[in-house]
């Protein structure tokens, strides 16, 4: 189009001139039609100046130069005596860009593509570029199966040579696959082959992966899956001959036909390794061993190549080349693999750099490195550093990049690119509950204090039954060897009666200090000491409570509901953690085991031990780690020493968002059985309706008392979160779950209390199922769950919807 205008303009100029081929001298240059473009800018773009002798070639070059600026859609050059007259029509300026009807493509993505093509507010409108964009967008819709889609650019003129640009989308509907045919398959049925496709002509309700909507990219992926399926089963001569995609007349249906040649199955006759093995021939040959008569397997060949690259990478060969060439013998149906290895140069690490850590100090990241500067590059050490950064929980993503140093044949820089997440949480709330009354809660937890890696927490709770404050600090690198030091102090004023638990009041305070010793990359041992003072009062005469007091030599009066008792305890605290999760925040693969325990030491009033074991295992079931199975368990047990019992206030409880969802917090397990007391014969809360003032026998209640043993398990399926863009995919997690748990009292005497539930029976398991959503919000982690209990017992209290701020187990 531009050349056509150029030709016309040249002809006009030629017809308007009366000079010969030798040209004429230009004394002045005048412009007509300039609005937005300054005269000076237009003159600078021209190869002609006043005083120059102008020929036809100069005029043609002038017109080309003015068109090349992109500011004009028409240019004419005329002669008026000794004056060169340039008549132009400026392209209109884009005043605004809007979109309408686009659902599959977001506005931000469209704006990025337009800007990449030079279409933005304030720039000139190039109608040719707009036409190309229209076609490109329509091609995109065709590739995802929307063959009836159309994209039209609507240009609305405005004053001062400006325009509004609006892209109007009519996306239509995606064409659905009516039938997929595979022609030429004999060894495997069509249904078996299609079962591995993402695209399907039939999708059962339970298949959340299959899709009937045609997409060109998915078809390409399915064809590669088909090829791999045959190659992995020995069909070395397998070939996809052709693929036909047919569209129905109404553009709503797709028929796909794939023509294949299976060929025969081939066995591997041997593997020959050649090339530069960098002195590691024995190790490489060990990776290429095959069993006699083993079928050719494309996936195993690829794995073998990658294993060789990883092996060489551990020794500093950062860019090895490994190529496998199959030598196919059709006569005996065998394949001999020729593996050519070129180790390449061995590289040193010049520098290790970090990018994206705007808050975290470099030293916090650098101390997690296992690769050293100045040493040979080890790919396994680089990966260990990445894993350790992920497990810190400070980052949403961690990526590595090995960059060659310009001008150096044997040096690289290792760059860790991180995206930081909010490592702190702040919560403040005022609420009202039927059990707690008016409730105030506030807390600050920062796992990466001022970017130093310190974990600092200040928490407090105030409601009708509890006043609690705690200050905790942990230095994960108390020594350069990675020994951690943590400590806390706390105060707790707790009225169990108002919390719907067994009736007593406990005012406690204490402190503890713990050292953590790294054993290896994945294991840490902990040891520490603690002190706690418990002051118990207003203890109602209750069987489990009185049993503990009797073991302590107190022998309280069963009719007195104002008993008091205090204890000072010193404890040895211990723990072990095994952590091989792929990251500390929203992990998708690996396991974590956490053992915590304590035992009283000489000088304590109580004598007991207590331990808790937590496990979590994540197993991805797809390559992208979007679908993950999570299994969790928690076991707890405690008991007295030397004839004493573990204090009842140390009992285990279950129920709530951190154990068995769908049940009210701490309500699963044994319930309190009260002795009659004179002040409670008035029907005060705590007794069931079966307890009358005239009774002298113990009375059953719905107040939870907990137990000295606990078992909880959960099976969870983590799924992609619907309606969430990729930008927030790492901040939101959705799952469906099945929880189960039980709490029991191993010292409960079912013979002595035959008319009551057997609280020593661990088989009284509660179960629930539901859905949960976790969101890493700017205020910290928020957890929402809805669960329906489907196995419960008398006295249990359901709570289907639960909301929690903070980490769950």
UniProtKB/Swiss-Prot annotation:
GO CC, alphabetical: Bam protein complex
Predominant cellular place of this UniProt entry's protein: membrane
Signal peptide coordinates: 1-20
Keyword Transmembrane tagged: yes
Protein origin, superkingdom: Bacteria
Subcellular location: Cell outer membrane
InterPro entries in UniProt: Bac_surfAg_D15, BamA/TamA_POTRA, D15-like, OM_assembly_BamA, POTRA
Biological processes annotated in GO: Gram-negative-bacterium-type cell outer membrane assembly; protein insertion into membrane
Entries under Gene3D superfamilies matching the protein: membrane protein fhac, membrane protein fhac: a member of the omp85/tpsb transporter family
Keyword Transmembrane: yes
Pfam families given in the database record: Omp85, POTRA
Disulfide bonds: none
The entry's keywords: Cell outer membrane, Membrane, Repeat, Signal, Transmembrane, Transmembrane beta strand
Domain POTRA: 24-91, 92-172, 175-263, 266-344, 347-421
PANTHER family in alphabetical order: OUTER MEMBRANE PROTEIN ASSEMBLY FACTOR BAMA, SORTING AND ASSEMBLY MACHINERY SAMM50 PROTEIN FAMILY MEMBER
Function according to Swiss-Prot or TrEMBL: Part of the outer membrane protein assembly complex, which is involved in assembly and insertion of beta-barrel proteins into the outer membrane. Constitutes, with BamD, the core component of the assembly machinery.
Family as reported in the entry's similarity comment: Belongs to the BamA family.
Subunit and partners: Part of the Bam complex, which is composed of the outer membrane protein BamA, and four lipoproteins BamB, BamC, BamD and BamE.
Protein's UniProt name: Outer membrane protein assembly factor BamA
